[in-house]
Curated annotation (Swiss-Prot):
Interacts (via C-terminus 330-346 AA) with GRK5; this interaction is promoted by 5-HT (serotonin). Disulfide bonds join 93-184. Serotonin binds at residues 100, 279. It comes from Rattus norvegicus (Rat). Residues 1-19, 79-92, 158-188, 284-290 are extracellular. This is 5-hydroxytryptamine receptor 4. It is a multi-pass membrane protein. Residues 45-54, 118-133, 213-257, 315-406 are cytoplasmic. The lineage of its organism: Eukaryota, Metazoa, Chordata, Craniata, Vertebrata. It is found in: Cell membrane; Endosome membrane.
Length: 406
């Protein structure tokens, strides 16, 4: 969100050396955000497996919002900050400020929706997740991420609601005494500061904390259940062991994904919390926060727009593979290996603690065949195809049965 870019009445501007350093830093931040978010969008569009994951719809929309922040907001802000002047007129100042509030709030809302999606995926039954996260509901959530921020951006800013009671202060701050020019100044009164900060940051932050806390508790319970299943299956037959191994892998994958998103949320809090705390405090202390503090907190928040793609690359294996394929021009080394005996999984109903149907792909006489069998899996784990090479007694029984039927 844009904030007062120059407090000329009580602060000195940046020196020549500082401007060169800042311009270099801003250029790196903007370039990193543009390339990184474009890479995320292209990766999901090209990778069919990434498109199958519902969470990635939010990630693509988030990348688009962060891309617009870099192109439409950061670039103009960097030019104004370095040159100590706003060239583009009062109307475009209002548009740019409104876009700033809209896009950064939309980015925060997307992170909140991602945390809720992961909560339903990990803490609820798979059937409950499918029923709740329908294509229609996902579309409504994505629409809300873009529409709701308009009510705290374009609507109040274009109507001047944020200026009520502080017009004189804004007029003093807009004028640059050194160059007889003006700045694009965005100041907010107390009601707008509280409303905007609560809607754009504090409510999403609270929802994310609650969601990730429940994810942590559920993942911890699942880890204990998996250990119990592994100990109980140590002396059992191979088929239950295979199911337990499959359940363990599934839960570890979900838990790792949750940890990745927790890191993303942690970076988001580190980047945006200083700004939103100051945004509420400043109107109550007569707007005495120094310009350079505002600049630092504002651009710390902007850095978050370029940080998310690199978090995906380093912490998410699927995205890392997709990025390598794109950057290495479809190098075959990074493509997913084909799955032998790939078939449609058996129809299952997954209920907490109930019996599930799993499909095994086994080798019989040099041919891969798919079969279904019942097994007890850990709670909240949906049945998926399992490929295994059966034991000798399995091969003997299954092949002899096939010969007798023929």
């Amino acid at each position: 969100m844009d904030r007062l870019d120059a407090n000329v009445s009580s602060n000195e501007g940046f020196g020549s050396v500082e401007k060169v350093v800042l311009l270099t830093f801003f250029a790196m931040v903007i370039l990193m955000a543009i390339l990184g978010n474009l890479l995320v969008m292209v990766a999901v569009c090209r990778d069919r497996q990434l498109r199958k994951i519902k969470t990635n719809y939010f990630i693509v929309s988030l990348a688009f919002a962060d891309l617009l922040v870099s192109v439409l907001v950061n670039a103009f802000g960097a030019i104004e900050l370095v040159q100590d002047i706003w060239f583009y007129g009062e109307m475009f100042c209002l548009v740019r400020t409104s876009l700033d509030v809209l896009l950064t709030t939309a980015s925060i809302f997307h992170l909140c929706c991602i945390s809720l999606d992961r909560y339903y995926a990990i803490c609820c039954q798979p059937l409950v997740y499918r029923n709740k996260m329908t294509p229609l509901r996902i579309a409504l959530m994505l629409g809300g991420c873009w529409v709701i921020p308009m009510f705290i951006s374009f609507l109040p800013i274009m109507q001047g609601w944020n200026n009520i009671g502080i017009v004189d202060v804004i007029e003093k701050r807009k004028f640059n005494h050194n160059s007889n020019s003006t700045f694009c100044v965005f100041m907010v009164n107390k009601p707008y500061a509280i409303t905007c900060s609560v809607v754009a940051f504090y409510i999403p932050f609270l929802l994310m904390v609650l969601a990730y806390y429940r994810i942590y508790v559920t993942a911890k319970e699942h880890a204990q259940q998996i250990q119990m299943l592994q100990r109980a299956g140590a002396t059992s037959e191979s088929r239950p062991q295979t199911a337990d191994q499959h359940s363990t892998h599934r839960m570890r994958t979900e838990t790792k994904a949750a940890k990745t998103l927790c890191v993303i949320m942690g970076c988001f809090c580190f980047c945006w919390a200083p700004f939103f705390v100051t945004n509420i405090v400043d109107p109550f202390i007569d707007y005495t926060v120094p310009e350079k503090v505002w600049t630092a907190f504002l651009w710390l928040g902007y850095i978050n727009s370029g940080l998310n793609p690199f978090l995906y690359a380093f912490l998410n294996k699927s995205f890392r593979r997709a990025f390598l394929i794109i950057l290495c021009c479809d190098d075959e080394r990074y493509k997913r290996p084909p799955i032998l005996g790939q078939t449609v999984p058996c129809s299952t109903t997954t209920i907490n603690g109930s019996t599930h149907v799993l499909r095994d792909t086994v080798e019989c006489g040099g041919q891969w065949e798919s079969r279904c069998h019942l097994t007890a899996t850990s709670p909240l784990v949906a049945a998926q195809p399992v490929i295994r090479r059966p034991q000798d007694n399995d091969l003997e029984d299954s092949c002899s049965l096939k010969r007798s039927q023929s």
